[in-house]
Every structure is written in C-alpha cells, then in structure tokens.
Amino acid sequence: MYAPRELPIVHVSVRSSEMIKYASNDFLALKISYINEIANFCEIVGADIEEVARGMGMDRRIGSNFLKAGIGYGGSCFPKDTKALNFQSDHAGVKLKTVKATIDVNREQRTKLIDKARRFFPTFRDVRVAIIGLTFKPGTDDLREAPAKQNIDILLNEGANVIAWDPLGVENFRKRYPDCAINFAENIDEALTDADVCFIMTEWEKIVEYPLDNYKKYMRRPLVFDGRNCYKLSEVEKHEIFYDSIGRKIVDTL
C-alpha cells in the first residue's frame, strides 16, 4: 500500500501515533486561528493581512500553508480533533491553553461577518440576505462545522429572509437541515436579486470569478461582506460597492 509512494515509515508507540495525529491537526488549526486574530488586529491598525501573511510565509520556519485569513475552519477534522484534545487534556488534569484558545478564537471568528454588518443592520428582521457558499471549503459538499449554517441560524432567529447558493452543497443542506426555512438559488445572480446584503462564506471559483459589477446590478444596495477574501482590493475599488473583507481595509465607493 505504501511502498509505491516511497513514503517514510515512522515506528512509534500507539499512544505516540495517536498524539501525532491530534498534535498535527491542532497545530494547523492553531495557525488558522492565529492568522485570523492577526487579521482582526490588522483591521484596527491599517495593515493588510494578505501582505502580512505573504511576508510571514516567506520565512521557511513558518511557511505559507494555513496562513489564509477568513471566518474560521470547519470540516470533520480540525473541529473534532481540537475539541477531543482539549477534552482529553482537561480529563488528565493538564490545561492546553493554546488548544483552548484555538477553539475560542475560531468560534468567535465564524460570526465575524454578521458582527461587521451590524453597522447597517442592528437587527436583520425583514432583511433579505444572500448567502454565497454553504460548504466549509470549495470542492466538496461537506457541511460539517461550516460557518454558513451557524450564521443562517442567527439570521433566521432575527427574522431575516435568507436565500443561499452553493454549487455542490444545496442538496446536502436540504437533507441535513430539512427544517431550515431558507430558499435556494440556482445561481449567484438569483441569490443576489433584490438582496439587501450579501455574505460570502466559501471561496468557490465561481465566486472568485464572478463579475463585481453584478453586485450593483442585482442587489438593492451592493453591501458585500466577504469572509474568504475572494477579491483583490485593487479590482474592487474599480466598482460601485461597499466591500468589507477579513483583515483588509473597507472599500466604500457608493
């Protein structure tokens, strides 16, 4: 099974092998939470997290992998393994403070876009909200621990009218959350039509390549909150839009 790939085989104890898996995933999750905290600070001091992450990643001791700011990690591995290691350490009487901090930061980061949008909508009652992207990452229909569902629940509890689009995740969302009272769009144009605000939750290629002019064309007012930094600010500035992303300056050309 492994010989054709010429992979190194490390002989360790069962306990050590388990710890390698937990420690590796938790360290990667920590990198994500760390860069998200730095991104939040960048917004206050006027730095650009894309530039900061690029500079950090050039240091071989750090590396550029998992230094992508956004609205937190999801999926089946990182949430499960961070919580498991935190539980096991507590049970053993050891406080793994960095692991707990990783979990706490990620939990708060997941609703960052709603927090940002409060400047326009103290409450979302009767607000038409477009959710662009449902899955925890592009290229999958996996909704486990995806930030979109948590945000949708908050919006619905406040009385918002939510319409969502995702190229792969819609059917899985319907099956997984049959009682979730939202509408689904066939394409991004339909999701944006007459929307008061747009939240980008997943960096699908179709979103990255989506024409920025269309936000103004279809929305009542182009208020866009991007949780995955899908667009270059230099391109956003060429269009009539309010655009707030993660760890970067706000573009307001309205």
Please give the residue ranges for each predicted region.
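Structural/interface elements that position substrates and couple domains in central-metabolism enzymes
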Residues: M1-L254
